[in-house]
């Protein structure tokens, strides 16, 4: 599973296109996560801005397995329309959503999970790691 977050932050969807085209010349069966947060936070400057509208075409492509790690967890927890719209686009296509919720537990974690975030690889404490399976979320 490839998450082309960095190249898409710099080059936009053209970076995703490049990665997918380059992988066609390998023996690997590469699946991709469409980056969910471009830029990663509203405080960053990047070479592209990918909003829900811009996600509608690439999320339907063969080889796009889901939405890449949703790093703007405060936006999800606080129900920011721009973030929820991205989640809706992915779910309408039957795609999974990868998580990125460092430090969130309890009610905040429940809110994050309610948005149907499927997994989280950011656990750094025993509490965080034990909370996720209890609410049906994988720690990967």
Describe the function of each predicted region:
Residues 1-94:
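Divalent-metal coordination cores built from histidine and acidic residues
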């Amino acid at each position: 599973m490839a998450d082309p977050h960095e190249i898409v932050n710099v080059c936009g969807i053209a970076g995703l296109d490049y990665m997918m085209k380059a992988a066609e010349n390998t023996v690997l069966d590469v699946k991709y996560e469409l980056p969910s947060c471009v830029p990663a936070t509203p405080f960053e400057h990047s070479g592209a801005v990918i909003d829900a509208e811009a996600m509608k075409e690439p999320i339907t492509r063969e080889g796009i397995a889901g939405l890449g790690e949703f790093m703007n967890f405060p936006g999800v927890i606080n129900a920011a329309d721009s973030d929820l719209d991205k989640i809706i686009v992915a779910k309408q296509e039957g795609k999974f959503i990868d998580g990125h919720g460092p430090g969130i537990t309890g009610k905040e974690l429940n809110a994050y999970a309610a948005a149907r975030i499927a997994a989280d690889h950011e656990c750094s404490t025993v509490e965080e790691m034990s909370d996720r399976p209890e609410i049906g979320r994988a720690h990967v």
